[in-house]
């Protein structure tokens, strides 16, 4: 029988060939086991190298953690076993409360007296600014979840304290996952990114404003520069909307060239804007996005007689064969680097072209090799989900700057991910921004560990 206060443990760094019956002898010495479950991928059924363990008694869990956590390395593993409370049990987030709309004059003791009737309080802290002035909010941590819930039920919205603008707010404090998501949203807002859905399905109104609104041109530059959040078709739409001289990796605004075709309608409804071959040829040679260079534009162009929808909603109509240096193919070549990150979007683009540009077939293999950035620009990412590949971590870290390379380390014998990777930026600021935003970020059961690669690690990346 499990005790009410039993602890659920997370067990990490276990060999993938060990199942529950193999692991039980290791843990049974500390007490009776209530439940032991190896974690497997829900799609492939593959062992993920970790497990959940619950003892019948809380004391057994504490003994196992004390004796085993980072103390013993199991056969075939490079790092010692991890034994610690599972996220849902451990961090007090289900018993820590955020209290808002306090009066500025209330102290820690005032808040403690308010919450003491509901149970034993471990912590009570009023948040203050650098000058010592109260911010009008506090954190209160109870010993149990039940006590915290009782306080919420009784106090939330129940009164308006002196000096407060509205009624008292009492709720559970944000979890680390929620804080990580908020940090990501703040980064996205600072970079001026949009929701891909909003961009695609709001394309018509964006085109309508693009003729006269310079702000839309700035937004288009940011969208193209941070195109990890878009599909290639939407990026083409941004290029038409702006018709700029150059898009550089930092989103610096370039000079518009010509006005786009007016949006006309014979039935009173908007029609998708069109892009002709002549207009595309007017777009100058360089379309450099996130540090990748495009194919230089040539003057040998065969104009197309068909309208091409570029708003990310309608697929291209198939075209008859044209000259090899068709400008649309050149623009498409500049986006080839994103097909790994967007396999679904790639399917929308590829039917438009009869054959891939020859220059892509001649790309030297050495360009695909792992490259490092300058010192202070390279970061390690640990605890990646098993299914993550190079393209996933590339997509994850592109918002923070120009990525020189992104690599997930793979076991040569099994061809399975080792659950850590390496990303190189071209400047230290981007690396620090990535660490600040992504360290501790939780993906499923994984909490990322992101840290700078130091020179001493150069010959020992593991």
From Swiss-Prot:
- GO BP of this protein: mRNA splice site recognition; positive regulation of mRNA splicing, via spliceosome; regulation of alternative mRNA splicing, via spliceosome
Q: Does the keyword RNA-binding apply?
A: yes
Q: In which tissues is it expressed?
A: Expressed in the nervous system.
Q: Which SMART domains match?
A: RRM
Residue ranges annotated for the RRM domain, each copy included: 7-88, 95-175, 377-455
Compartment(s): Nucleus; Cytoplasm
The task this protein performs is described as: RNA-binding protein that may be involved in the regulation of pre-mRNA alternative splicing.
- Record's protein name: CUGBP Elav-like family member 3-A
- Name the species this protein comes from: Xenopus laevis (African clawed frog)
Upper lineage ranks?
Eukaryota, Metazoa, Chordata, Craniata, Vertebrata
